[in-house]
């Protein structure tokens, strides 16, 4: 784990109410596995809020990395005001990232909302290792979708919106269709209702492969000290920050 002040490179809207921030830090960008996260202190030195915020690595490029965040409270409002050259205190990388198959295969990535973030990093790594990747993303409206240029060009980008403004109408887990049979491995990140829906769909279709999910829980500390991110699994209580955020879908849902 590295504790370092990262320098803001850019901080721009990805979609309404959600920003993509690029930061520079050789230490924080080194040896990152897709699915890992870092803690970002979203205030000036010693100011409120006290607890850091957890953000997944969305992209990593050399000594730079990007995070995707929604502006929903004091901390992220402060973060949204940072400009190029500002310093932001962070520590990471933390958690257990995704495991990619040794042999190239067909990978289906399922995401919703800001849950898209670690899946972009996963797609970049997977494409580089020769995997075929389909990214199926769900959003409320077309305006809430991550623009296609953020994905590697080799990725097939499929989107679903709840209002039907782009792609099929409904929830992303209800439109997996042919991709369920095509996929040799499934990864997902998003809210818990999406995970539950994904588990139900796969069970109903007799697909008992074991998708890896990246859970989104409030993680005040990031290393297992506060027990604020407990996840109840069939193997007992686990901590999202320390034991996750990668879990087996059917161990939790």
Predicted regions and their residues:
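Ferredoxin-reductase
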Residues: 2-84
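Short, Lys/Arg- and Gly-enriched loop/turn segments at beta-strand edges
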Residues: 45-55, 95-102, 241
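FNR/FR-type flavoprotein reductase catalytic core
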Residues: 74-218
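A charged, well-structured terminal subsegment
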Residues: 172, 237, 249-253
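Nucleotide-activated chemistry modules centered on ATP-dependent adenylation/adenylyltransferase
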Residues: 201, 223-224, 245-253
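Local cysteine-cluster metal-coordination motifs and their immediate loop/turn environment
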Residues: 216-245
């Amino acid at each position: 784990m590295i504790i370092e002040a990262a320098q803001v490179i850019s901080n721009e809207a990805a979609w309404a109410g959600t920003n993509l921030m690029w930061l520079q830090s050789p230490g924080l960008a080194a040896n990152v596995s897709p699915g890992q996260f870092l803690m970002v202190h979203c205030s000036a030195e010693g100011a409120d809020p006290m607890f850091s915020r957890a953000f997944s690595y969305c992209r990593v490029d050399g000594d730079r990395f990007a995070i995707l965040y929604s502006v929903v409270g004091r901390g992220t409002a402060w973060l949204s005001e940072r400009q190029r050259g500002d310093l932001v205190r962070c520590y990471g990388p933390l958690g257990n990232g995704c495991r990619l198959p040794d042999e190239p295969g067909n990978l289906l990535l399922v995401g919703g909302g800001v849950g898209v973030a670690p899946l972009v990093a996963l797609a970049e790594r997977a494409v580089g290792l020769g995997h075929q990747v389909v990214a199926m993303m769900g959003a409320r409206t077309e305006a809430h979708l991550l623009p296609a240029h953020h994905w590697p060009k080799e990725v097939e980008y499929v989107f679903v919106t709840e209002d039907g403004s782009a792609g099929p109408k409904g929830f992303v887990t209800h439109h997996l269709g042919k991709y369920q049979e095509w996929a040799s491995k499934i990864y997902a990140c998003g809210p818990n209702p999406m995970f539950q829906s994904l588990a139900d769909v796969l069970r109903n279709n007799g697909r008992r492969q074991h998708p890896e999910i990246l859970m989104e829980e409030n993680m005040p500390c990031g290393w297992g000290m506060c027990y604020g991110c407990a996840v109840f699994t069939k193997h007992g209580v686990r901590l999202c920050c320390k034991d996750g955020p990668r879990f087996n879908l059917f161990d939790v849902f």
